[in-house]
Amino acid sequence: MLTSFNAFLDTVDSLVWGIPLIALILFTGLLLTVRLGFMQIRKLPLAVHFLTANETSGEHGEVSSFGALCVALSATIGTGNIVGVATAICAGGPGALFWMWLAALVGTATKYSECMLACKYRTVAKDGHIIGGPFYYIEKGMGQNWKWLAKLFAFFGVLVGLFGIGTFSQINGITSAIRGFFDPDSAHTVRVLGVLPEVSTSVAISGVVLTIVVALVLIGGMKRISKVAEFVVPFMAIIYVICGVAILLFNVTKIPGAFVEIFQSAFGLRAAAGGAMGAMIVAMQKGIARGIFSNEAGIGSAPIAAAAAQVEEPAQQGLVSMLGTVIDTLIICTITGLAIVITGAWKVEGLEGAAVTTRAFQDALPIPSQAAAFILMLCLCFFAFTTILGWDYYSERCLEYLTNDNQKIVSGYRWLYIFCIFIGPYMTVSAVWTIADIVNGLMALPNLVALIALNGVVVAETKKYFAKRENKISALTRS
């Protein structure tokens, strides 16, 4: 029964993440990159400046520009960076990392565009809080005739929260990492409530504790999520990057060989002639799918957080938000991927998910293996924890749109979300990630269509902002 279900999921996954969706993701990113004049490269220093400057603050919004980015990063920097990269490389070979980079490069322009549009078309909910995202820029930007597409996006957004990035994959990754450290052989097991599958005691205990902690934070709403994210995300990201850079420095002679392996695998050059195209397609599918899972460029989630930023100019928040893709994929995922390829951890039989990355850290860091495993477990737990918080916020905003801001339904949904966190540890790793891929792809489709339709608005708004900025700078210079 379970085998048939997994086979069904694999079939659906192959259909959703076929060539058409991959082509649409790359086309959207390339279109916006070209039309914006490679702005993600030219304006990167300005984006970093806006991150810390007071220049972005405005009257509208609930959190700072930095806070909005941290909420977005809290939702994106999660198991995708540690477990997702490992599963992509194990399934598609080292070449998956190349396609992840390519998707991120053009995805940075996508992230700028969707977050800018979210700020431009945001609105105020009945209780006074700011709400925005693809559902509003589809409805307001494309017109009422496209409201069905906005509702479709919001519906898939709820599904991604419940079954995709938000719950199952994150809590499953956390508890798997904890079990791998405290009880790798599952010597101590328990059957919770007498009906759930038998699991390691460490999994059961950590699952219950995390469910309670998440529930306490979620009750506080957006501002509490923002405060937690602003503290946790930078701290844990710095620790992870330091460990990753240490791995690369201690294995610097292996880096050139790793890049050769990545590029050969990306284009199927190591496969037999007849299987080269097939190997390339698998690497492309897994790399782009996991890249989207990790940085969420094009999915339409980050715009929901960006809409709450205290900015007057939509383009400013777009610039700040695009840094999320740079930090998430081009830095953190690259560190994970290179560590896995350099150490060959992806080739070890019997390892999957977090265990692959753990093995890479243990083999590459010049510290006791238990210490390396503990550091990775800690990073994974905090990354995944903040992702759970961020995706509750995203999916609740989607549900508010679907239900015309019915807070009774939203409150009920919050408890359903918490329940999904409770049962997540008892699901298999492969099923969790396949379900996540499927719903992510479905959520991305309406948003990508909207970004293509509204690319003219993006370009016009961007030109208007930079013209205004140039005039302001010129006036200050003359005075």
Language-model features: where?
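Membrane-interface loop-to-helix entry segments
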Residues: 24-31, 39-48, 171-178, 201-251, ...
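Extracellular/periplasmic helix-exit of transmembrane alpha-helices
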Residues: 33, 114-121, 126, 243-261, ...
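Flexible loop linkers connecting adjacent transmembrane helices
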Residues: 38-65, 87-97, 101, 109-145, ...
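Transmembrane helix-loop junctions in multi-pass membrane proteins
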Residues: 5, 36-40, 80-85, 161-174, ...
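N-terminal alpha-helical transmembrane segments of multi-pass membrane transport
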Residues: 1-79, 89-96, 107, 249, ...
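Alpha-helical membrane segments and immediately flanking helix-loop junctions
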Residues: 58-91, 117-141, 152-155, 159, ...
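Membrane-interface alpha-helices at helix entry/exit sites of multi-pass transporters
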Residues: 57-62, 94-102, 137-152, 186-196, ...
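Helix-loop-helix module between adjacent transmembrane segments
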Residues: 28, 32-33, 74, 103-128, ...
